[in-house]
Amino acid sequence: MAYYKGAASEGGRAAQLMKRRELAQQEVEFRKKKIEEDLKVSNIENKFAAHYDAVEQQLKSSTIGLVTLDEMKAKQEDIVREREKKLAQKKEEKDKEKLKALEAKLAEKDRQKRQIQALSFDPDDEPDGDDANDGDEGSGKESEKEDVKEELTVVKRSWKEQVPSGVKKIRKNPDVDTSFLPDREREERDNRLREELRQEWAMKQATLKDQEITITFSYWDGSGHRKSVAMKKGNSIYQFLQKCLEMLRKDFSELKTVMADQLMYVKEDLILPHHYTFYDFIVTKARGKSGPLFNFDVYDDIRMISDASVEKEDSHAGKVLLRSWYERNKHIFPASRWEPYDPTKVYDKYTIKDKSKK
């Protein structure tokens, strides 16, 4: 180790200068690293800003008029996806160019080596020192060639690892049941089939409602006056009462000032609301307390004791009467048996008398 051979004060001064120099060098290195880090961050931010600005510009140019938030988000996602795809393609092209440049560099070195080997040299003309230098130069070229090959291999490997991510396609397994997945063609086919069936059913119901039936009824004012009228199955009880009223006004003077709203239709001991149609009772095969509501023909009395347990489709003539008459006589048989029609109520057996009275 060398020692300072001079005055002690000069030696201390030299030590301080050395220390200052080291501190200055450390500060320079610190600033250099900080500048490099700032440059890296700024490059990243610039790339991100450029990417974001490009996306925003493309989004503004492709958006026309007012759009919803969901449409804006979907369009933004599509633009970002396209932007990322383009960036990936550019990166892939750069990697390919770098690979081509390395291959060209390696090919050039191989060509130069072949040209050098093609020249003839007399080993006796050169001194031994030159041979040693040539050996060193050859070994240096070999090491440089190995470095280039290694770098080329690394680039090829990285490029092969990146390419499948964009090229590889996800294929379906034909053996997997995908019937539960949404399928636009299948849904459209099912919707068409449902619409065809609906139209076919609607046509059948319209044809059924247009069919005519003969309804036998009895005007009831304490005794029966039987008549019949032709109606369509799609007609309502109110329309039926209007037609009955037109027919009965000729024979009964008390009905000349009466409207259809003031009449009632009682079928199988049930008071039928005016808004129901004959089609409603026929389709549902509704039943009343003393017979079926869907059959409007007239038979003999079916409420015999011997036949009470037998299911029949014979029916009685429905009664058309004034609502005022019912209000006056609803405590007297047969009006005491009548009750409003309830579609939720089931009449399993027909009866001949009121069960509440024994």
Curated annotation (Swiss-Prot):
Organism of derivation: Anopheles gambiae (African malaria mosquito)
Pfam families recorded: XAP5 (PF04921)
InterPro entries per UniProt: FAM50A/XAP5_C, XAP5
Highest taxon above the source species: Eukaryota
GO CC entries: nucleus
UniProt biased composition (Acidic residues): 122-137
Annotated region (Disordered), positions in chain: 104-151
Listed Basic and acidic residues bias regions: 104-113, 138-151
Gene Ontology terms: biological process: chromatin organization
Name this polypeptide is given: Protein FAM50 homolog
Family classification: Belongs to the FAM50 family.
